[in-house]
Swiss-Prot record:
Gene that this polypeptide is encoded by: secY
Any single GO BP term: protein targeting
Transmembrane segments: 19-39, 69-89, 122-142, 157-177, 189-209, 219-239, 275-295, 318-338, 378-398, 400-420
Name the record gives this protein: Protein translocase subunit SecY
Subcellular location: Cell membrane
Annotated source species: Streptomyces scabiei
Length: 437
C-alpha cells in the first residue's frame, strides 16, 4: 500500500490533488484552535482539565468538530450543521414532491438541492451557535466545573451577537473548505474533514485512558483499548465491504445494423445499507431528554429518572433504548434512501431484468424482499458495533463517542475505504497498481 501511495504521489495530477487536500486540512486544523472574542479561555481550559467529559450530544458534536466545540473556537460547530442539513434535506426529499422532482433532474437539480443545503446549514449554524453561547453562559457546558459560569464573563447583546456571527462564519468557511476538497482534491470534502476531526481526538482520548489506568501505570488499559480498537476496525472493514449482488441481464436490441445491450451486471446491496446515519440519529434523539432536564434545572421525579436511566450511557435503560432506536432508524433510512420501485422502473425502461423475475412490479417486490432480509443483520450489526465497544471499554472511562467507539470507527473506516477506492480508480486509469491488491 505504501509503494502504491508513493507511486500515486509521483503522478503530477494526483500529487497536486493530494497536496491541495493536505493544505486544506492544515487550514481546517488551524481554525479549530483560533479563539472567538468574548470567551475567558483560562476558565475554558480549567474546565476541560477538570471534567474530561466526552459523553452525550456535546461529546458527539465535539468529536465531529475535532475538539473545537468545548474549546469554543471559530470552528466550534464544525461540520455538524452541514451533516444535519444534509440529513434533513434528504428526509424532506421523500415528503416534498418539489424536492423529489429536483432530485430527478440530474446535475441542475442536484445543484439546486446543494444550494438549499447551504442555506439550511447557515440557519442551523445560527441556531446551534446561539444554543452553544447560551449553554456556555449558563455553565451547563461544563456542569461539573466550578468556573463554568465564568466562561463568558460579558453577557451583553453585542458580545453574544459577535460570538454567534463568528461561529456561523466559521461554519460557512468549513463548508467552503469541504467543497474545495470535493472539487479540486481527493475524496468527498466533508467526509475527509469529518475523518480528520475524529482522528484529531485520538491522541488525547487514548492518553487519558492511560492516565486513568491503575495497572502497570495505565499501560495495560492502554493496550486493551488498542487491541479492542484494532479488532473492531477489522470487523467493520469486513462488514462494510459485504454486499448482496442482485444479477441483472439486459436484453439485446437491434438499432439499424448494430446490436446493443445483452450485457450482464448486478445491483450491489450493502449489508450496512444505512451507513452511519442511524447511529447519529439515535445518539441525538436519545440525548434530547437529558438536554431538557439540564436546561430546566428541575429536580422532580421525572428529571431524576431521566438523569439516572437515559443520561447515563452505562444504564440498562439507555443501552436498550439506544439499541432499538438504531434498528428503527436503520430500517427507516433504508426505506427512504433506496426506492425499489424506481430501480425496477429504470431497469424496465432500459430493457434490464433479474433472471427468473418478471420486470416491473415483481422486480420491485423482489428487491424489497431482499433489502429487508439484509437490513435485519445490518441493523443488528450497527446496534452491536455501537454498544459493544462502549460496554467493553466502560470500566476504562470510555463512552460511545470515544475514538474507538462504534460511531467513530464506522465513520473512519467508511471514509477511509471510499477515499482509498477513489485513489485506486485514478491509479488504474494511469496503469499503476492500486491500493487494494
Amino acid at each position: 500500500m505504501l509503494t502504491a501511495f508513493a507511486r500515486a504521489f509521483k503522478t503530477p495530477d494526483l500529487r497536486k490533488k493530494l497536496l491541495f487536500t493536505l493544505g486544506i486540512i492544515v487550514i481546517y486544523r488551524i481554525g479549530t484552535h483560533i479563539p472567538i472574542p468574548g470567551v475567558d479561555y483560562s476558565a475554558v481550559q480549567f474546565c476541560i482539565d477538570q471534567t474530561k467529559s466526552n459523553s452525550g450530544l456535546f461529546g458527539l458534536v465535539n468529536m465531529f468538530s475535532g475538539g473545537a466545540l468545548l474549546q469554543i473556537t471559530i470552528f466550534a460547530l464544525g461540520i455538524m450543521p452541514y451533516i444535519t442539513a444534509s440529513i434533513i434535506l434528504q428526509l424532506l426529499t421523500v415528503v416534498i414532491p418539489r424536492l423529489e422532482a429536483l432530485k430527478k433532474e440530474g446535475q441542475s437539480g442536484t445543484a439546486k438541492i446543494t444550494q438549499y443545503t447551504r442555506y439550511l446549514t447557515v440557519a442551523l449554524a445560527v441556531l446551534q451557535g446561539t444554543g452553544l453561547v447560551a449553554t456556555a453562559r449558563s455553565g451547563a457546558l461544563f456542569s461539573q466545573c466550578p468556573q463554568a459560569n465564568n466562561i463568558v464573563p460579558d453577557d451583553s447583546i453585542f458580545t453574544t451577537l459577535t460570538m454567534v456571527v463568528t461561529m456561523t462564519a466559521g461554519t460557512a468557511v468549513v463548508m467552503w473548505l469541504g467543497e474545495l476538497i470535493t472539487d479540486r482534491g481527493i475524496g468527498n470534502g466533508m467526509s475527509i474533514l469529518m475523518f480528520i476531526s475524529i482522528a484529531a481526538t485520538f491522541p488525547s482520548a487514548l492518553w487519558s485512558i492511560k492516565e486513568q489506568g491503575d495497572l502497570a501505570g495505565g499501560w495495560i488499559e492502554f493496550g486493551i483499548v488498542i487491541a479492542v480498537g484494532l479488532v473492531m476496525v477489522a470487523l467493520v472493514v469486513f462488514v462494510e465491504q459485504a454486499q448482496r449482488r442482485i444479477p441483472v441481464q439486459y436484453a439485446k436490441r437491434m438499432i439499424g445494423r448494430r446490436s446493443y445491450g445483452g450485457t450482464s451486471t448486478y445491483i450491489p446491496l450493502k449489508v450496512n445499507q444505512a451507513g452511519i446515519i442511524p447511529v447519529i440519529f439515535a445518539s441525538s434523539l436519545l440525548y434530547i431528554p437529558a438536554l431538557v432536564v439540564q436546561f430546566s434545572g428541575s429536580t422532580a421525579g421525572w428529571a431524576a429518572w431521566i438523569q439516572k436511566n437515559l443520561a447515563d450511557t452505562a444504564a440498562p435503560a439507555h443501552i436498550t433504548v439506544y439499541f432499538f432506536l438504531i434498528i428503527f432508524f436503520a430500517f427507516f433510512y433504508v426505506a427512504i434512501s433506496f426506492n425499489p420501485e424506481e430501480v425496477a422502473d429504470n431497469m424496465k425502461k432500459y430493457g434490464g431484468f433479474i433472471p427468473g423475475i418478471r420486470a416491473g412490479r415483481p422486480t420491485a417486490e423482489y428487491l424489497s424482499y431482499v433489502l429487508n432480509r439484509i437490513t435485519w443483520p445490518g441493523s443488528l450489526y450497527l446496534g452491536l458495533i455501537a454498544l459493544v465497544p462502549t460496554m467493553a471499554l466502560a470500566p476504562l472511562g470510555a463512552n460511545q463517542n470515544f475514538p474507538f467507539g462504534g460511531t467513530s470507527i464506522l465513520i473512519i473506516v467508511g471514509v477511509g475505504l471510499e477515499t482509498v477506492k477513489q485513489i485506486e480508480s485514478q491509479l488504474q486509469q494511469r496503469n499503476y497498481e492500486g491500493f487494494l491488491r
